[in-house]
């Protein structure tokens, strides 16, 4: 991500000149966050100053500043004798440093500008560090060509205007991507390369687009039919979240293609009837009979239709896979740890227990669907996360989906719902990636 090529780590190089001190500090901070994001030569250089486990970062930064000050005399001497540095002009160009910092800001904070609220109920404040002025740039620089460094766009340099257009397209459209808090460098770099190389778009062929349209139409059609035929009957519809159905279907098909044999789904009320029909294949006639009161329980007093579980088998590219939708109690989120226990038991039964080194457990996949207010507000969510990386309870990873219809039970004002910007911020404690 640095504009300076580090050919040698010595005291006689102009990259350590005083006017680069702030750049080196920023580069070192970047190295501390993600070592793989800087050139390999810089990695080796920084490693010299942090080889001891007791090394203090402030001391290392002070060492860089000392080196920079020591270079001032050399720089003045070169100017007086007419000699020049071996590095190109942009090595010491503060504009280039500003461009790189702007790219990093988009990766860190571009999600703050993403268009996530179709109802426009919560206007978003201007993100200061995504402005040109914050990085000592101006509109006069827009047509200047700069090196793109590690920006994955297929070219080594581009005008600043084009760089900004690409970053806006990747990070600030209708999908917010927040991943810079992830501590695993390979995971972070994979996400960076994937979204930037695709310019923020997932490319589907015609067949896939038709399949998605079919799923969306089925999801929307069911909700409209139930609303019209059973007006006023409680059903916890999926209106506004219909894209959830093709998303879950894609997860199931992809997982099956990778060899997963069972998928266990846990969810609350909203969208449950749609999942029963359009994901697990429950006969719609059976659902309508439940609405009409024609179904009598064999034992006990029965339960409401949006608590019922179901299981079925579906075909995937990897063969037949078993789906199970767990029965749901009315207490929000309590199904999550129950689901994890069910998945772990199924993995043990298949002799496929996962370990903490990310091996095993691939035969059974847990999928948990949350509501936005419950995900942020129910303590059992954090408790389940806390157990997710322990030897006895890990399931090897869970797909979490949050359906946010912007109404948390009886509270619609975000300031009264939670203390964080996103309902998924609680997952940051466990270094999960977030896509909104």
Predicted regions and their residues:
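Cofactor-binding active-site loop characterized by glycine-rich and histidine/acidic residues
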Residues: 261-436
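Active-site pocket-lining segments that scaffold enzyme catalytic pockets across diverse folds
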Residues: 225-285
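Hydrophobic alpha-helical scaffolding
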Residues: 14-17, 32, 89-92, 153-157, ...
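A glycine-rich phosphate-binding loop feature that marks nucleotide/adenosyl-phosphate handling sites
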Residues: 45-48, 119-124, 184, 267-275, ...
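Extended, charge-enriched "interface" segments that sit outside catalytic cores
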Residues: 4, 12, 49-244, 260
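Short, hydrophobic/amphipathic alpha-helical packing segments
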Residues: 99-100, 164, 244-252, 335, ...
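Subset of Sec-pathway N-terminal targeting signals
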Residues: 6-49, 55-56
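Amphipathic alpha-helical packing elements
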Residues: 99-122, 251, 255-275, 366-369, ...
